[in-house]
Amino acid sequence: MEYIPILILVISFIGLLAIGTPVAWSITISALLTMLVSIPALPAFTTVAQRIGTGLDSFALLAIPFFILSGELMNKGGIAHRLIAFAKTLVGALPGGLALINIISAMLMGAIAGSAMASASAMGSILGPEMEKEGYSKEFGAAVNITSATTGLLIPPSNVLIVYSLASGGASIAALFLAGYIPGILTGLFLMLVASFWARKKGYKVGKRSTFKNIIRTFIDAVPSLFMLVVVIGGIVTGIFTATEASAIAVLYSVVLGFIYKEITFGKLPQILLDSSATTAIVMLLIGASMSMSWAMSFENIPQDISTGLLSISDNKIIILLIINLLLLVVGIFMDMTPAVLIFTPIFLPVVIKLGLDPVHFGIIMILNLCIGLCTPPVGSVLFVGVGIANTTIEKVIKPLLPLFVVMIIALFLITYLPQLSLWLPGLFDL
């Protein structure tokens, strides 16, 4: 194994992050320094620039800006209030009712908007003050909001699953979307169990039981928002349209729904477009930079070296998957999700394929690992959003966050070692 390129890549990347260099620049500079081991400066600079551009030259990636815009439209279109109202009628009378409402609403919001940060922001700003008024500690409310927001990244439509499809060399987007449902719901149920137990232990108030009439009324109010999932996912799975075409349909549906709800006006559209453009620019820069690093690693045979190293430790699937899970949990602590998927999929996927693992199953394992990282300092973006919305500190949130982390890790290992949790639904549709 050639250690020098790996050492240069790892040390330069961690060092750049440590001194506060933006992630995209850290990735690009690390890729460049790694390539300089083998080729002269001018070709190295030229190749990195080319790879950033060609890395974005993919029809599948067109879905990302459209889904981001759709999520922004849904977020500003009053969807969060309607989902919360519906969730409240279902679980509001149970112990920890408001926490359970947060989790269910976040799962639905994340699935529809496709953004954990949007979900954490919306749920935290709406439910946070209400939870505090009912006697919940704001630290517990923030912990529930932070962890539940990430479940929507597993429940489609999910931009990061599209990114994984690209990084894996063509894993079916439809299969990935279907594979995310059971793991996402299972993780949400585990979070609900912990939240309910914690609320019962602390003696938090229980809400009033809703009438059947009220359940039906709030459901009807939420149906137009939920129906978008049926249109988008149903269209992709049945082959009526591709994920990219589905994303454009989602934008059209979101605009029409926002006007019907009277939450979006023509005057608000420019700001919505500006916000979604800014988010898209960040995501696309990260994708381009990550593609340059992936190419640099392939050029230096780093994935093959790591694959050989892992398989030399053991050829036991259980042990190798345990090692990969631990590595991905560490990666999630220090790296944003999109670059992590693009950089580490080419490294670990060949290993798990040799062990007989399905690429779709591994995609769900990887995303759930990185979802846990989004809730973890030092770069957990959802953690910072949730703490900021709740007006508290990371140190105070850690205690209520720990039991939620534990059940997320339990869910991770169940999903890792019980592949049918991910593969049953795709198999049902012959995907």
Predicted ranges, named:
Residues 1-431:
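Alpha-helical transmembrane segments of multi-pass membrane transport proteins
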